[in-house]
Amino acid sequence: MTFPPVADPSSLRILISNDDGINAPGIKVLERIARTLSKDVWVVAPETEQSAAGHSLTIRRPLRVRKVSARRYAVDGTPTDSVLLGVNHVLKGKKPDLVLSGINRGANLGEDVTYSGTVAAAMEGTILGIPAIALSQTLEHPHPVKWGTVEHWAPDVIRRLLAKGWSRNVLINVNFPDVIAASVTGIEITRQGKRKIGDEIMERHDPRGEAYVWIGAQRAEDRSKPGTDIEAVFRGAISVTPLCFDLTHRDDMKALETAF
């Protein structure tokens, strides 16, 4: 089963969320992008930054949904909470036709997708039966974020994806390179790459001498494998990666049958 192609997105109801929070610059960029596609745009996003929240759901405390302004709501929860409440609470009278998540400040490549709240928000939309796209703008420190790149290219990428359609159990993960818009080398369909594991744990001590730790966020990328999201983005291309939330490894499933 596939989502039907959409030649003209102007009639779509679009729900936007993210993991950087409702006041993040990236979500404002995504709002502008979405309004080039349709005028029926809604935002339901976390009240505060939820980076690396993954696909977590808040079930041990009540959640508050605060109306920020017309068609903009903040949730004191995770990106997954925000999409779930956006679809089944804020927009329960007329559910969205498309979920857009982002624009994330920084890439979501390789194993990043398992931690990413940006990808998780799109995953929740997919689980709820709605086409969903996660969008991230790659950032290489100390460069400023090139929001102009994603704002220039994203409308065309989204329109092309909608015109084609994709499978109902699939979300689309799009990463934009850390180059100016004019230097983008193209749009490429890619597979998920693999980052080299980074085990950086930084130990510090507070004024009372008690130890605490930070988990290092940096991972080394393997940029050498053609066809991956990592290789494409660091070559200056936009990567478009279809992701499936069915994590079953069917070859090992068959192999393990002989153990029981």
From Swiss-Prot:
SUPFAM superfamilies named in the record: SurE-like
Keyword Transferase: no
GO cellular component: cytoplasm
Subcellular location, record wording: Cytoplasm
Domain of life: Bacteria
Cofactors (names): a divalent metal cation
Similarity section: Belongs to the SurE nucleotidase family.
Protein's job: Nucleotidase that shows phosphatase activity on nucleoside 5'-monophosphates.
Protein name per Swiss-Prot or TrEMBL: 5'-nucleotidase SurE
Species name: Paramagnetospirillum magneticum (strain ATCC 700264 / AMB-1)
The organism's taxonomic lineage, starting at the top: Bacteria, Pseudomonadati, Pseudomonadota, Alphaproteobacteria, Rhodospirillales
